A protein has these predicted regions:
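Residues lining hydrophobic/aromatic ligand-binding pockets adjacent to catalytic sites
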Residues: 3-206
Length: 206
């Protein structure tokens, strides 16, 4: 079991504390099943966080076809490429707690103004509508949307993954995340500590 080594430094209060953002991976679902899940959870807008909004293996989730299907269910669609994955890791990365190069690259990208502006755009929609962030991967812990979830959590926003038509799962912040205000980083020191087998003990630093 990982020790919870999440550090939170100076989290600022925000009007977004009562806001909830849903997440979902389209995976290999039929479009009808996908729509039923969205409707069951009252989703009003899908925010597509794929870098490239198309799928050769699941063409029903290519941007144009998906947007048409959503319109029929009166659900809005927005692609925000600035939240997309596939970001290269920096040689001087401060996020070496991630052994996975893809996640480390996205964590590096999270330090940029482009990411912050794109996330703010997402939050502006979430203030008005129930949004669901959508990517391709079935489970969030294999997808960069889990890191987006960390960034939203740092801003006081509740994040829940759609699991079924009747159930969601609360997002768990990455155990080795270091949160300072709204900045999230993943230092190696915290990762090494969190991976050490021990009882789960939460630590918060103010």
């Amino acid at each position: 079991m990982w020790e919870m080594a999440v550090c939170v430094v100076g989290r600022e209060a925000s009007s977004s504390m009562m806001m909830t953002v849903l997440t979902i991976g389209h995976s290999t679902r039929a479009i009808a099943e996908f729509m039923r899940l969205l409707e069951a959870h009252g989703v009003e807008r899908v925010i597509d966080v794929r870098r490239i909004p198309r799928s050769a293996h699941n063409p029903q989730f290519s941007r144009e076809r998906l947007a048409r299907a959503l319109r029929r269910s009166r659900i809005h669609y927005r692609h925000i490429p600035g939240l997309g994955g596939r970001r290269p890791a920096r040689r001087d990365s401060i996020n070496t707690g991630w052994r996975n190069a893809s996640f480390r690259g996205y964590a590096d990208y999270m330090q940029t103004e482009t990411f912050s502006r794109s996330l703010d755009r997402c939050i502006s929609f979430a203030r008005r509508e129930q949004v669901a962030l959508m990517c391709a991967e079935a489970v969030p812990w294999r997808c960069h949307r889990s890191l987006i979830g960390d960034a939203l959590a740092a801003r006081g926003i509740a994040v829940h993954e759609i699991v079924s038509g009747v159930r969601t799962r609360a997002h768990a912040v990455t155990p080795w995340a270091l949160i300072k205000g709204t900045q999230v980083t993943y230092p190696a020191a915290l990762a090494n500590e969190s991976r050490r087998p021990s009882p789960a003990v939460a630590r918060r630093t103010r």
